[in-house]
C-alpha cells in the first residue's frame, strides 16, 4: 500500500518508524538540536540561546524558515536585503515566517528556546549569507 503526495515520490504506508536521538551542535551563542533533517524536504530544530547573545544577521538564498518562540523573550530583526530592518519583541508563542532573501537576526533578551522549521533545498546546510556576526563568522557558512 502506498500514499501519493502531489509532486513527491510515493511513500509506503508500511515503512517502519525510526527512533533516534536528535543531533546536538554547540554554537557560540548556545546550542541547537536538529531533530529532523530530511534532505530535499524539511528540517526541524530546537534552538537554545543564552541571554545577551545574538545569532548572525543573515539571509538565505533558497531556504525559507518559520521560527516560533517557545520560552523567554527575544528581539527579532527582519526586513529586505536592501532595506531597513524592523525589530519586534517576541514572547512565547510568537511566530515569524521568513521567505528566502529576508534578512533576519534573533537576539536573546533572556535565555530563550525556539523551534525552527525550514525547507531543505539542495545545499541547505551552506545556504546562509552572514552580513554581521559577533563570533567571527561574517561571510562564511560555518556552523
Language model regions located:
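Short acidic-glycine-tyrosine-enriched beta hairpin
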Residues: 80-101
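A short, N-terminal "cap"/entry segment at the start of jelly-roll beta-barrel domains
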Residues: 1-43, 54-56, 88, 128-143
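Glycine- and acidic-residue-biased ligand/ion/polar-headgroup-sensing regions
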Residues: 62-79
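Conserved short histidine dyad/triad with adjacent acidic residue
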Residues: 45-63
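A short hydrophobic beta-strand segment most commonly corresponding to one strand
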Residues: 66, 110-130
Amino acid at each position: 500500500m502506498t500514499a501519493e503526495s502531489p509532486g513527491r515520490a510515493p511513500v509506503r504506508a508500511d515503512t517502519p518508524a525510526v527512533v533516534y536521538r536528535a543531533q546536538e551542535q554547540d554554537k557560540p551563542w548556545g546550542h541547537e538540536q536538529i531533530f529532523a533533517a530530511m534532505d530535499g524536504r524539511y528540517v526541524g530544530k530546537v534552538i537554545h540561546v543564552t541571554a545577551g547573545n545574538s545569532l548572525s544577521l543573515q539571509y538565505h538564498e533558497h531556504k525559507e524558515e518559520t521560527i516560533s518562540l517557545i520560552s523567554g523573550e527575544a528581539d527579532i530583526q527582519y526586513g529586505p536585503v536592501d532595506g531597513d530592518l524592523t525589530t519586534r519583541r517576541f514572547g512565547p508563542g510568537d511566530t515569524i515566517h521568513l521567505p528566502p532573501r529576508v534578512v533576519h537576526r534573533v537576539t536573546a533578551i533572556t535565555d530563550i528556546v525556539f523551534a525552527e522549521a525550514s525547507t531543505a533545498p539542495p545545499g541547505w546546510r551552506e545556504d546562509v549569507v552572514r552580513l554581521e556576526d559577533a563570533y567571527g563568522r561574517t561571510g562564511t557558512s560555518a556552523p
